[in-house]
Amino acid sequence: PYIYYSIKLKNPSRIIKPEYGKFAELTNGNIFYQEFTSNNPLGQIVFLVHGFSTPSIVWKGIAPYLTSAGYDVIAYDHYGRGFSSRPKVDYTKGFYISTLMELIDHLKVKQKVHLIGYSMGGPIVGHFANENPNKVESVNFIAPAGYMFKRKSQSNVYLKILNIPFITKYISVVFPSLMYGGSSSIKLSTDEDENRLSQNELNTVYREQMKYEGFTRSLVSTAKNFNLFNTQKMFQELGKKNINSSVIWGDADEIV
C-alpha cells in the first residue's frame, strides 16, 4: 500500500496557482497569498494567519469586514498547505516566524502590521510579536492553540509516537492518499452570513491540497517540531509587552 500511495500523490511542483491569488517566491519556495484592498484605506494592513491544516480560504468571510473598516488585508497559506510549496524542512516555530517575516519584507510593508491568528496561527503571531515587537501594531487571537494537554507527560507520549520513523513516513504518504477525493472533516451549517465560506468551497480546497506530496508531512513535522501544546510562557511574555492584543473564543464557531 505504501508504494501505491506514494505513486498516487502528485509532485508539489505541479501545484497550479488559482486566479484569485498570487505567489510570493521566498527562500523555501512559493507562498500563496490573497490581497484584499480597502476602498477607504486607513493606511494599515492586517495579516491573517491560519491554523494547523485548513488553508487561508477560511478567511473568506472575514476579509470583507476588515476591508470595509479601512484595512488592507493579506491572507496566506503556510508552507505545506493550500497552494503553497511543500519544502522538506523541519516545520519549527522559527520556520513559521521567519516565513511570515520574509513575506512581510517581500511585500515591502514598512509600517507596523496587525496580526490575526486562529488556532495554530495564534502561537505563530504571538511568537512573532514577542520576537519582533517593533513590527507589530496589534496581535489578535482567535481560539489560539497552546493548551491541548493538561500535563506535559501527555504531549511527550504523543511526540514519542510521531518520532518513530516508520509511523511518520507511513502517515505522511498513506493518509492523504486515502483521503484523496474526500472532503474536509469540518461540516458547516451556518448560513446567515452572505460572505460565509461554503461547504463546497472548503471541500474543494481540501481535496486540492491533499493531492500533493508534502501536505501531511508538513503536519507531522509541525506536530513534532513546533511546541503547540504548552505555549503559556509565550502568552505570559507577550502580556508584559506594550502591544495591543485581543483574544476571541466563539462558542458557535464551526471552523475552530
PLM regions and their residue ranges:
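Short beta-strand/loop motif that positions the catalytic acidic residue
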Residues: 241, 247-249, 253
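Active-site loop/oxyanion-hole signature of alpha/beta-hydrolase fold enzymes
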Residues: 27, 34-36, 40, 68, ...
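Conserved HGGG/HGGXW glycine-rich cap/lid loop of the alpha/beta-hydrolase fold
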Residues: 29, 35-83
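Flexible "cap/lid" loop of the alpha/beta hydrolase fold
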Residues: 130-131, 138-170
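Alpha/beta-hydrolase fold catalytic core
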Residues: 1-44, 68-71, 232
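Acidic catalytic loop of the alpha/beta-hydrolase fold
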Residues: 226-227, 251-256
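Gly/Ala-rich beta-loop-alpha elbow adjacent to hydrolase catalytic centers
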Residues: 117-121, 125
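Conserved alpha/beta-hydrolase catalytic His-Asp/Glu region
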Residues: 150-152, 170-241
